[in-house]
Amino acid sequence: MDREKLASLANNVEKFGFGSLWFPEATSFESFSLAAYLLANSNKLIVGTGIANIYARDAVTSAQGHDGLNALFKNRFILGLGVSHVSFVEDIRGHKFGKPVSSMNEYLEKLENAGIDPNLRMEDRNIILAALGPRMLELAAAKNKGAIPYSVTPDYTAKARAVLGPEAWLCVEQKVCLTKVESEARNVARKQMGRYLRWPNYLNNWMRMGFKEADLEGHGSSKFLDAIVCWGSEKRIMSYLEEHLSSGANHVVVQALQPDGMEGTDFPVLQALASK
């Protein structure tokens, strides 16, 4: 998206009545730069990174970014941190990909000791972790506000809540596609999920969730695609989102996929869900 489309996205999300806007970090905009722009183009919207790569900047810089944005924009920024993927870390950034949990724990310790604002305790910072497996979930509950798992089901949400305990934030991501045409929805899901089915951390988590190897071959089985990308009527989509909430999520991050398979956010489904 260019700057005009990003500003329009923030304005529309806020106008529809949503409380937050989340974005990823890959090879486009740098996380803190984009967060500042989105915050500047909204009034009350909470902006979160989903997620900022810990290999993209050192822990002191992350502490500065988190503390600075929250000071400038009245505590409207959430820093979601993640270890990303081997290919992004080693092939694109040229770093060595470490063991996920130990690397994240070390990063958080450095962030805690950064000394940017001596009056701000680590537990008071708006930091959550991209966590899928139980050990990263445990770290998220122990060191931060909570977790933001990606591409999961309501059953997973219930299990994650059990690991996190009752107090930690649990913000789960859910892809949706507003179409009642099965073939259309499945085509969108295949296009969306194909990129993720080659990354070990997601594959391992989906296997833990009960999917079989056959479900995760190629672009994914119909069973897998329907579980990860919810499609159908507004009522059906809303019901699936509510399943996450009743399973223990505090917040559901909706990724609205366009039914025609084009890139970008599907505003009609966001507007429809906002009215529910």
How does the language model describe each region?
Residues 1-276:
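Active-site-adjacent structural elements that line small-molecule/cofactor binding pockets in enzymes
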